[in-house]
């Protein structure tokens, strides 16, 4: 068991949920569910196991988890994750056909059945469900509400279920084909999550029984209504409306923000994205900027719907994602619970990050010394790392972070706006930044770093070396951190010529480099968001006579967002020292731009 796993085991919550075991390459090799995540995941690394489990444990290099609200939700989520990732240690149940389904038969008088085989027989299939117990629980509820045919008796003979109101004897009750088709439609709507009609019918019957002093019958309908409500909660992870949607949640603490996105495809929660970064503005503004950049990434296709937390401005999100995406801010019910689940997982992820950092920092001194030995250089007490950030060449920036004795020294961090480069040219941008940084180090007699780490491969390293050696006559070791196709820290490049330094992925040295790369990447992205936000803000204020840079800055500082300015009065803007005529012209322009 490596140190990362040891640390993460200590931080597991006692909640139900799913866990995903990963190998040294970051591949998901097993998905499991648990009523108690802490107890279940810890059990893999304690005591003896059978041969199959021992083999699994031997390949586990890391794990992650998703917290759910109930064990049933964990069961449903487990199915989705297994079908999406097909981990090699899970039983591969292709197409979910070994799981139970609820079926409505295509007969003149349809029946409700449970089956494990999906056939092209014209029947309607709902599921899959995690186990027979879950399917039976739902079918029993359906049987109590919808009086489908439940027997194979001849037409002139009624069954037991007829006497308890759960079967319409097709001959005696003179039901028509239209009646049965209507019943089928009601069940389809019910299982697809549209149960308001049924609940209202049950409430009406409960009131009717109560008015007739039939209190036992009224209690039966009350119990049915409660059962429907419980079912609605238990089926939260598999939405029966088959809609594609992204569900956003976030959490902020200690100057950091964690954004958690649940990807729901065809009604099933199949994947999530977790991103953590320092934030420097208002939390809502940084969250909005994140959403805007999230869908600029070609890996993230826009869904049909987006759910956002209640404290986020809906109109701002709609402006960011465009008219083709519907944005919802759920206030109650199942959809609100999904957003709450994303918020809860964001909090768990960020809390875990802080706890892991505290544990890791204590071990970094030895990692620094070993890193120097592996690279053949003196112990790199001070490390400076660089990264660029831009979107298609717009608002290009770069950033530098400093680690001393394995700890970030934020007072030494530096931000750079690219001044001499036009368009998206990472190499030219980095050449400018390295020149500016180390010209100053040389000119002002500052202490140079023991190691420079570039967030990139051979090209970035060669650019830095060229500037240092041939322009500035400085001798500072330069290494590169290369990422894999999943955008994860993968290899350390160093030497002349460059070579891969062999670092075990679970070593403290690798964790240190990963933290450095993660920090410089987040710092650069956050700075880029700030610059783009200010540029966008400023451009919308252009063209108003009497509104210069200083007054724009006042507006930005006090109102934080364009939405806030649009909602302000002339008097609110005048309070900042802006003349009434200019304030009115500004509001008129913003009103025109919004139409």
Curated annotation (Swiss-Prot):
<keyword id="KW-0227">DNA damage</keyword>
<keyword id="KW-0228">DNA excision</keyword>
<comment type="function">
    <text>The UvrABC repair system catalyzes the recognition and processing of DNA lesions. UvrC both incises the 5' and 3' sides of the lesion. The N-terminal half is responsible for the 3' incision and the C-terminal half is responsible for the 5' incision.</text>
</comment>
<dbReference type="GO" id="GO:0009432">
    <property type="term" value="P:SOS response"/>
</dbReference>
<dbReference type="InterPro" id="IPR050066">
    <property type="entry name" value="UvrABC_protein_C"/>
</dbReference>
<dbReference type="InterPro" id="IPR001162">
    <property type="entry name" value="UvrC_RNase_H_dom"/>
</dbReference>
<keyword id="KW-0742">SOS response</keyword>
<dbReference type="InterPro" id="IPR038476">
    <property type="entry name" value="UvrC_RNase_H_dom_sf"/>
</dbReference>
<dbReference type="Pfam" id="PF14520">
    <property type="entry name" value="HHH_5"/>
</dbReference>
<dbReference type="InterPro" id="IPR001943">
    <property type="entry name" value="UVR_dom"/>
</dbReference>
<dbReference type="Pfam" id="PF08459">
    <property type="entry name" value="UvrC_RNaseH_dom"/>
</dbReference>
<comment type="subunit">
    <text>Interacts with UvrB in an incision complex.</text>
</comment>
<dbReference type="GO" id="GO:0009380">
    <property type="term" value="C:excinuclease repair complex"/>
</dbReference>
<dbReference type="Pfam" id="PF01541">
    <property type="entry name" value="GIY-YIG"/>
</dbReference>
<dbReference type="Pfam" id="PF22920">
    <property type="entry name" value="UvrC_RNaseH"/>
</dbReference>
<dbReference type="InterPro" id="IPR004791">
    <property type="entry name" value="UvrC"/>
</dbReference>
<dbReference type="GO" id="GO:0005737">
    <property type="term" value="C:cytoplasm"/>
</dbReference>
<dbReference type="InterPro" id="IPR035901">
    <property type="entry name" value="GIY-YIG_endonuc_sf"/>
</dbReference>
<dbReference type="InterPro" id="IPR047296">
    <property type="entry name" value="GIY-YIG_UvrC_Cho"/>
</dbReference>
<dbReference type="Pfam" id="PF02151">
    <property type="entry name" value="UVR"/>
</dbReference>
<feature type="domain" description="UVR">
    <location>
        <begin position="196"/>
        <end position="231"/>
    </location>
</feature>
<dbReference type="GO" id="GO:0009381">
    <property type="term" value="F:excinuclease ABC activity"/>
</dbReference>
<dbReference type="GO" id="GO:0006289">
    <property type="term" value="P:nucleotide-excision repair"/>
</dbReference>
<keyword id="KW-0963">Cytoplasm</keyword>
<comment type="similarity">
    <text>Belongs to the UvrC family.</text>
</comment>
<dbReference type="InterPro" id="IPR000305">
    <property type="entry name" value="GIY-YIG_endonuc"/>
</dbReference>
<protein>
    <recommendedName>
        <fullName>UvrABC system protein C</fullName>
    </recommendedName>
</protein>
<feature type="domain" description="GIY-YIG">
    <location>
        <begin position="14"/>
        <end position="91"/>
    </location>
</feature>
<dbReference type="InterPro" id="IPR010994">
    <property type="entry name" value="RuvA_2-like"/>
</dbReference>
<keyword id="KW-0267">Excision nuclease</keyword>
<dbReference type="GO" id="GO:0003677">
    <property type="term" value="F:DNA binding"/>
</dbReference>
<dbReference type="InterPro" id="IPR036876">
    <property type="entry name" value="UVR_dom_sf"/>
</dbReference>
<keyword id="KW-0234">DNA repair</keyword>
């Amino acid at each position: 068991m490596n140190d990362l796993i040891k640390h993460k085991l200590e931080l597991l919550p006692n909640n139900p949920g799913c866990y995903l075991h990963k190998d040294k390459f970051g591949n998901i090799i097993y998905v499991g569910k648990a009523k108690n995540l802490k107890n279940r995941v810890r059990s893999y690394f304690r005591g003896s196991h059978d041969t199959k489990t021992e083999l699994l444990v031997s390949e586990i290099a890391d794990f992650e988890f998703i917290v759910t609200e109930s064990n049933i939700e964990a069961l449903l989520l487990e199915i989705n994750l297994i079908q999406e990732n097909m981990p090699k240690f899970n039983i591969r149940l292709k197409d979910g056909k070994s799981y139970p389904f609820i079926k409505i038969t295509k007969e003149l008088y349809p029946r409700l059945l449970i089956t494990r085989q999906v056939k092209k027989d014209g029947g309607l299939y709902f599921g899959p469900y995690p186990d027979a117990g879950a399917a039976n629980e739902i079918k029993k509820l359906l049987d109590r509400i919808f009086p489908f045919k439940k027997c194979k008796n001849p037409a002139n003979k009624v069954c037991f279920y007829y006497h308890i109101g759960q079967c319409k004897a097709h001959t005696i009750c003179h039901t028509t084909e239209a009646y049965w088709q209507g019943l089928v439609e009601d069940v389809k709507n019910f299982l697809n999550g549209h149960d308001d009609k049924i609940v209202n019918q049950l409430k009406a019957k409960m009131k009717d029984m109560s008015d007739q002093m039939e209190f036992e019958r009224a209690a039966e309908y009350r119990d049915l209504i409660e059962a429907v409500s419980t079912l609605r909660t238990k089926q939260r992870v598999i939405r029966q409306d088959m809609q594609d949607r992204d569900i956003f949640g976030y959490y902020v603490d200690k100057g950091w923000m964690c954004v958690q996105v649940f990807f729901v495809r065809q009604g099933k929660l199949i994947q999530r994205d977790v991103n953590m970064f320092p934030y420097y503005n208002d939390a809502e503004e940084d969250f909005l900027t994140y959403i805007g950049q999230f869908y600029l990434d070609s890996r993230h296709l826009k869904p049909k719907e987006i759910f956002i937390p209640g404290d986020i401005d809906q109109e701002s999100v709609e402006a960011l994602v465009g008219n083709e995406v519907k944005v919802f801010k759920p206030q109650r019910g199942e959809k609100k619970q999904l957003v709450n689940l994303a918020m809860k997982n964001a909090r768990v992820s960020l809390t875990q990050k802080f706890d892991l950092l505290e544990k890791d920092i204590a071990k970094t001194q030895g990692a620094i010394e070993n890193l120097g030995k592996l690279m053949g250089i003196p112990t790199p007490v001070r490390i400076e790392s660089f990264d660029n950030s831009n979107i298609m060449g717009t608002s290009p920036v770069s950033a530098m972070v400093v680690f001393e004795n394995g700890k970030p020294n934020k007072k030494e961090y530096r931000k750079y706006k690219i001044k001499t480069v036009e368009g998206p040219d990472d190499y030219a941008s980095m050449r400018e930044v390295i020149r500016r940084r180390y010209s100053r180090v040389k000119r002002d007699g500052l202490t140079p770093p023991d190691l420079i780490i570039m967030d990139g491969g051979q090209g970035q390293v060669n650019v830095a070396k060229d500037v240092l050696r041939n322009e500035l006559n400085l001798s500072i070791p330069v290494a590169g951190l290369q990422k894999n196709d999943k955008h994860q820290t993968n290899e350390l490049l160093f030497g002349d010529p460059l070579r891969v330094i062999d670092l075990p992925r679970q070593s403290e040295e690798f964790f240190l480099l990963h933290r450095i790369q993660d920090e410089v990447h987040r710092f650069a992205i956050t700075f880029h968001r700030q610059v783009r936000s200010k540029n966008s803000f400023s451009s919308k204020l252009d063209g108003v006579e009497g509104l210069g840079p200083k007054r724009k800055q006042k507006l930005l500082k006090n109102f934080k967002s364009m939405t806030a300015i649009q909602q302000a009065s002339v008097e609110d803007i005048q309070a900042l020292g802006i003349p009434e005529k200019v304030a009115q012209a500004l509001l008129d322009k913003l009103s025109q731009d919004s139409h």
